Amino acid sequence: MASGGGGGGGMEAVEVRFRLDDGSDIGPSMHDQATTVTALKEFVLARWPQGKEIAPRTVNDVTIINAGQVLENNRTLAESRNLAAESPEGPITMHVVVRRSRPERRVKQPPKARPPERIGCGCTIL
């Protein structure tokens, strides 16, 4: 098995391919159906190709999509599968989206009060 995730439970392993945004793949690789989505993200993160322009730094930067549905971190592979969308032959293709964590936003300071504009003329008569 390529990754664990909490007990075998006698479930059959599943072959999964992770498709990246540029069309390249990680895998296919075998995963236990009890593997959590978080463990799948860790698997992808550990095998991310070097030299890619966009690369995740943490598991939170990775989103996995299967059959058009964003997979939740606490769910297992078995709970996240869509049997109607899967081919009986070959691996399940899951799409990987990288979304960088946004840095914490600084609280905007209210604009400083401007000094009142002078009203009047600055002309000198000779």
UniProtKB/Swiss-Prot annotation:
Underlying gene: MUB2
Subcellular location: Cell membrane
Name recorded for this polypeptide: Membrane-anchored ubiquitin-fold protein 2
GO CC annotations, alphabetized: plasma membrane
Record's bilayer topology term: Lipid-anchor
Propeptide: 124-126
Domain Ubiquitin-like: 14-79
Functional summary from the UniProt entry: May serve as docking site to facilitate the association of other proteins to the plasma membrane.
Keywords from the named record: Cell membrane, Lipoprotein, Membrane, Methylation, Prenylation
Chief location: membrane
InterPro entries (alphabetical): MUB, Ubiquitin-like_domsf, UBL3-like, UBL3-like_ubiquitin_dom
A Pfam family of this chain: Rad60-SLD_2
Lipid-modified sites (S-geranylgeranyl cysteine): 123
Cysteine methyl ester: residues bearing it: 123
